[in-house]
């Protein structure tokens, strides 16, 4: 048997290399930021069918909905950071995996990289992001724990001028806007039907914050499709023990293919006093249309509660109202109402929903809620032939 002898110098050298590698690995781990969400939702809708059917209560729909997302941020050097987002869900729209429990079996999820970009912070008070990233504007929804996300490849720069003013400009040479949900699922229609994702998108946003108030204004243009702008204001005030959070926003989207100029304005306020809370909001669209963004749930749209969504509905007004109480530190109970009043030139019908919700926050990063209510749409199947639905939902979400 041959015995190999190692000199003291060799042993010290090998130990130094191992220690250096361990130090590099430790430093690399320290420089990695990890966050994300995991969400599960069960929907159960028992719906009446057309009055032409002998049994009007045979319609029903139930589904399991899943989505998991992990965000990774790695410091490359003092000026550069790499960001990525990995999603397990539906690759088509970076959304959730939906499994109909009545017509489909269990399936595995798509796992894909939805974001991969670099931040450059070498310019004072400025962040420049290059690569595939979320498109963050009032017209889009860039992140959602359970829903589609707007992404694209481009360059975004944000600069801060003191604590009050910031400016952001972005340009994308391609997006996934063709797979976004820009209108209500029960009535109304999106006018962004010819978007294929290859169109370039550019926007500029200015924000001013002062004395508890924040004012923002954004202009965006999707090549050969639309020009849009949105102006919003919100506040946060405390008067003794009363907390008030009012807001208002006006948005307009002008289609290039037609003379239609879609508008939607909305205003609302959240109030909290002790264990009690209340929320009320009102919105309205014009006769030409209510499509004012690529996603119905974006800031420019109005989708405050559950199935009643004003986005994409023309010549209509909506009201959303909630009262709630914090029963314990972990349990909140609320009663919610939503209603849409459609005008004579609307592309939809009157609709309303009322539901109760019990939310339970087991820990800082684990929450769940259960909902049960009633949803109705007038003349859904024809004249005097309404949709009536008993709706239920269970939602569980973990954040890290």
Task: Label each PLM-derived region with a short phrase.
Residues 2-135, 155-162, 208-209, 234-242, ...:
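Beta-barrel outer-membrane channel/assembly domains of diderm bacteria
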Residues 45-47, 81, 93, 139, ...:
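Intrinsically disordered, low-complexity acidic/polar segments
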Residues 50, 95-114, 123-223, 291-314, ...:
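Surface-exposed coil loops of outer-membrane beta-barrel proteins
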Residues 62, 142-149, 174-177, 196-200, ...:
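Solvent-exposed loop/turn segments connecting transmembrane beta-strands
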Residues 87-88, 173, 284:
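A short, sequence-level motif marking secondary-structure junctions
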Residues 209-211, 230-343:
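Detector for outer-membrane/organellar transmembrane beta-barrel domains
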């Amino acid at each position: 048997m041959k015995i190999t002898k190692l000199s003291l110098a060799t042993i010290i050298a090998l130990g130094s290399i191992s220690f250096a590698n361990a130090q590099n690995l430790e430093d690399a781990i320290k420089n990695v930021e990890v966050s994300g969400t995991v969400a599960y939702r069960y929907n159960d809708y028992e719906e009446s069918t057309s009055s032409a059917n002998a049994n009007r209560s045979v319609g029903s729909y139930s589904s399991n909905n899943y989505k998991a997302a992990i965000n990774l941020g790695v410091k490359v050097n003092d000026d550069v950071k790499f960001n990525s987002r990995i999603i397990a869900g539906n690759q088509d729209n970076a959304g959730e995996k939906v499994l109909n429990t009545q017509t489909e079996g269990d399936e595995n999820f798509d796992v894909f990289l939805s974001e991969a970009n670099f931040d450059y912070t070498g310019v004072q008070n400025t962040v420049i992001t290059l690569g595939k990233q979320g498109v963050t504007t009032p017209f889009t929804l860039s992140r959602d724990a359970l829903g589609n996300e707007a992404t694209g490849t481009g360059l975004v720069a944000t600069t801060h001028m003191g604590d009050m003013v910031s400016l952001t400009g972005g340009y994308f040479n391609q997006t996934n806007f063709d797979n976004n949900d820009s209108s209500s699922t029960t009535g109304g229609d999106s006018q962004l039907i010819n978007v294929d994702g290859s169109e370039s998108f550019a926007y500029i946003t200015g924000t001013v914050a002062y004395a508890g108030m924040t004012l923002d204004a954004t202009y965006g243009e999707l090549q050969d499709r639309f020009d849009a702008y949105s102006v919003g204001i919100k506040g946060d005030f405390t008067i003794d023990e009363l907390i008030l959070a009012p807001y208002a926003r006006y948005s307009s989207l002008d289609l290039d293919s037609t003379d239609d100029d879609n508008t939607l304005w909305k205003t609302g306020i959240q109030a909290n006093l002790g264990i009690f809370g209340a929320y009320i909001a009102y919105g309205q669209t014009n006769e030409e249309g209510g499509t004012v963004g690529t996603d119905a749930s974006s800031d420019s749209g109005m989708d405050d509660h559950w199935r009643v969504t004003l986005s994409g509905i023309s010549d209509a007004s909506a009201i959303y109202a909630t009262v709630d109480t914090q029963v314990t530190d972990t349990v909140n109970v609320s009663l919610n109402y939503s209603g849409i009043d459609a005008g004579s030139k609307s592309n939809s019908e009157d609709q309303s929903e009322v539901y109760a919700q019990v939310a339970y926050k087991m820990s800082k990063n684990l929450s769940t809620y259960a909902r049960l209510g009633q949803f109705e749409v007038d003349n859904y199947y024809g004249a005097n032939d309404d949709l009536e639905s008993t709706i239920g939902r269970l939602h569980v979400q973990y954040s890290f």
